[in-house]
């Protein structure tokens, strides 16, 4: 079927665009010899893992469930980092992960020997205290007082011999100039530890918008080579968004039109339920064939069927009047959508579909009342 024939609401993964992103990432790997992992926190649609696995080295996880998903569905390198690990989970994690990164030396001291006995490569996350985030403090791991990563003041030289690698993750949707700035801070504060003979790898985390049209890939590759050559380490990069950037849609139908001073489209999709970053970040998601408010002839506010007054996606304009029953297509909806959605107000989760490289769509998963009630008791 075609995309306009899909049931709504429905997420759609565009496999042609997904492959294009993967080809860009693989070229970085081929040019530099670095390793690239899928950060599953952004995109976990495992039916695409066979495709992703053709290009990338494996997966990285934020806890046990993601680690199990990567292990079972991709079966390549499997890394995990979490702010803390439960004692009840560490055994299973060491059975399925090759790399385990700790957030503190107290956790490393507790578990490192056990991990080593299981043949797991052990790392520590550092905080270079170099903030490059700008306006989005909620996504800044280097914000004052951040719980994420060990600062230089708290770095324990007495435990450094237990380490195999060092990890940092400070970026969010950023270009490689910010990585270059961050690396200078990492080298200044932690360079002497990177030079130790037991340190075999450096993981530069995610937030690298490598597949964005204006991303400076040449600078990224220079950064990677510099760290490889200076410290004789394997460099890992673990993008999430860059893997599936602009490779998905959320198809929604106009259910009603309300005008209480602002012409408002009531959609069967919701910002609060189906694209929570719209309210959390906040941001205005791209919408196919639309413009900014008042840019085109007909302007509408887009909202949803929930009772939340602030469940507003944004104001958009169109060349033609919108009618009840029309379908709209939000773009760049593969990332941080399905992994974060919810059933507030009893809203149904959108179906999930894939679009093959010829443009044909097939529904992979549908949801109903059963999924809603199963989570609640």
Write out the residue ranges for each language-model feature.
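Active-site-proximal beta-alpha core segment in soluble small-molecule metabolic enzymes
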Residues: 34-201, 215, 223
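Acidic, glycine-rich loop-and-beta core segments that form the ion-binding/anion-interacting portion
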Residues: 186-242
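Glycine-rich beta-alpha junction loops
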Residues: 126-130, 170-174, 208, 241-243, ...
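N-terminal capping/small domains of soluble enzymes
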Residues: 1-75, 81-85, 270, 318-331, ...
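A short small-residue
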Residues: 2-6, 164-170, 205
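Glycine/Thr-rich phosphate-binding loops of Rossmann-like dinucleotide-binding domains
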Residues: 110, 132, 176, 212, ...
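Charged (often Lys/Glu-rich) extended helix/loop segments that serve as interaction or gating elements
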Residues: 223, 237-377
């Amino acid at each position: 079927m075609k995309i306009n024939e899909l049931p709504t609401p429905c997420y759609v993964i565009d496999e042609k665009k997904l492959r294009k992103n993967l080809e860009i990432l693989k070229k970085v790997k081929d040019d530099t010899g670095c390793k690239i992992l899928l950060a599953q926190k952004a995109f976990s649609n495992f039916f695409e893992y066979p495709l992703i696995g053709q290009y990338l080295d494996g997966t990285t996880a934020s806890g046990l469930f993601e680690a199990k998903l990567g292990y079972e569905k991709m079966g390549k390198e499997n890394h995990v980092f979490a702010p803390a690990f439960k004692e009840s989970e560490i055994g299973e994690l060491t059975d399925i992960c090759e790399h385990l990164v700790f957030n503190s030396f107290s956790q490393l001291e507790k578990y490192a020997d056990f991990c080593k006995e299981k043949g797991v490569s052990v790392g520590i996350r550092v905080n270079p205290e170099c903030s490059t985030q700008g306006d989005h403090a909620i996504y800044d791991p280097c914000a004052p007082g951040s719980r994420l990563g060990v600062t230089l003041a708290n770095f324990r030289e007495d435990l450094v011999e237990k380490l195999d690698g060092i990890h940092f993750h400070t970026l969010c949707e950023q270009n490689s100039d910010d990585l270059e700035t961050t690396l200078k801070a990492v080298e200044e504060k932690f360079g002497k530890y990177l030079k130790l003979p037991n340190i075999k790898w450096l993981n530069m985390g995610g937030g690298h918008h490598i597949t964005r049209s204006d991303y400076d890939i040449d600078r990224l590759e220079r950064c990677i080579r510099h760290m490889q050559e200076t410290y004789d380490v394997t460099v890992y990069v673990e993008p999430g968004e860059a893997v599936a950037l602009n490779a998905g849609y959320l198809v929604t139908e106009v259910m009603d039109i309300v005008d209480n001073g602002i012409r408002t489209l009531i959609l069967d999709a919701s910002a609060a339920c189906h694209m929570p970053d719209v309210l959390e970040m906040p941001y205005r998601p791209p919408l196919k064939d639309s413009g900014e408010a008042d840019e085109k002839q007909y302007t509408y506010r887009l909202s949803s069927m929930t009772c939340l007054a602030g469940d507003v996606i944004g104001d958009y304009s169109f060349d033609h009047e919108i009618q009840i029953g029309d379908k709209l297509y939000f773009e760049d909806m593969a990332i941080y959508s399905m992994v974060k959605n919810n059933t507030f107000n009893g809203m149904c989760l959108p179906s999930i579909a894939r679009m093959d490289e010829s443009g044909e769509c097939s529904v992979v998963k549908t949801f109903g009342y059963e999924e809603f009630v199963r989570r609640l008791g």
